[in-house]
Amino acid sequence: MREFLSSLFWPTLTGILAAAIILDQWVLPEPMGRDRNQVRTSYSDAVALATPSVVNIYTAKLVDSGRNQRLNDPLLRRFLGNSGRRQQVERSLGSGVILTPEGHIITNDHVIADADAIQVLLHDGRSATATVIGADPATDLAVLQIDLPGLTPITLANSDDAKVGDVVLAIGNPYGFGHSVSQGIISGLSRYGLQASDYEDYIQTDASSLLGSSGGALIDASGKLLGINTLIYTASGDGADHAAIGINLATPVNLANFVMKDLVNYGTVVRGWLGVSVELLQTQETSVQQQVLMISGLAEDGPAARAGLRLGDVINAINGNTVNDGRITMHQIARLRPGEVVDIEV
């Protein structure tokens, strides 16, 4: 029996030694997660950087709840008068992001629309009543301002650099759970066609957003603001079913910052106008499908007409940038300033 056991053990030991000698000739990869710089196991630094700039927003408005049916009695109306309509306070919540040391906060227009009172709660526990600086329903964005010292404006990313697959984090106030954080990736870019606003150019992500998250921050892995969480795509498509299905949409920060600056400086968003109506046409360049703009209408004595553009002209480039997506190009035109000279190639 001893000889049998020895004969079984020795070949096994020999095989292990041989394998060790062979493997020693190769450079083995480092185990995953050993180096924090190689594999990101935590986004706590990014969250710590951005969270002080994210606020909870609470709104209240008086709504008419109808007439008390008892006041339909003519005898009661004789003594109490005809002011029998009742009002009640309707409360709502949302999120916002501090963009300037002066207390300017970007949020969604639908968060604060028609509110009679707006209260902002900061991460450090302080609170303040907010003033509405301006709103832009065309992008569903609004700017508030609070008067508190020591505010921390968030650092802005460049949303034009965002790529599908990038890790993102959503920070907001879902159902009143303030400064909640969820993680996901960018699932798509330049989403539109939802008829939620006039200028749709959303970042799609699967980072969880729920009721109360609107107006909150979508940040990148370094803690910089990439977008403003705006919409939740629900199973029913009408917002009645709020079950999360992993499709959440954020307004890019480049657009949000443009809107914020105009609302602060002018009280409204000043958009460029060429005086043209266009149709989007699909073209096929080799194997790539592109969109171009064909002029289908001209405003009399408008900028385009004065520049010599004609009906049927196809816009190929604006300021040297090839038109690959007609919708995005029209958004870029809207961001131009009145009086700014534009080079249009047809």
Residue ranges and their predicted role:
Residues N37-T41, L49, D64, Q145, ...:
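Soluble non-cytosolic domains of exported or imported proteins
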Residues W10, Q88-G96, I154-N158, Q204-I219, ...:
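Gly/Ser-rich catalytic serine loop of serine hydrolases
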Residues Q25-D45, L49-I105, A113-D116, R126-S127, ...:
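Glycine-biased strand-turn-strand hairpin within the trypsin-fold
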Residues R91-L93, I98-H179, G193, D201, ...:
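Conserved active-site neighborhood of the chymotrypsin/trypsin-like protease fold
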Residues L62, D116, A135-T139, G188-L194, ...:
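Short, conserved beta-turn/loop elements at beta-strand boundaries and strand-helix junctions
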Residues Y43, A115-I118, L151, I171-G184, ...:
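Active-site loop architecture of trypsin-fold serine endopeptidases
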Residues P52-Y58, F79, G96, G103-T107, ...:
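Terminal peptide-recognition signature
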Residues M1-P29, D45, T131, Q145, ...:
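C-terminal recognition in membrane/secretory proteostasis and scaffolding
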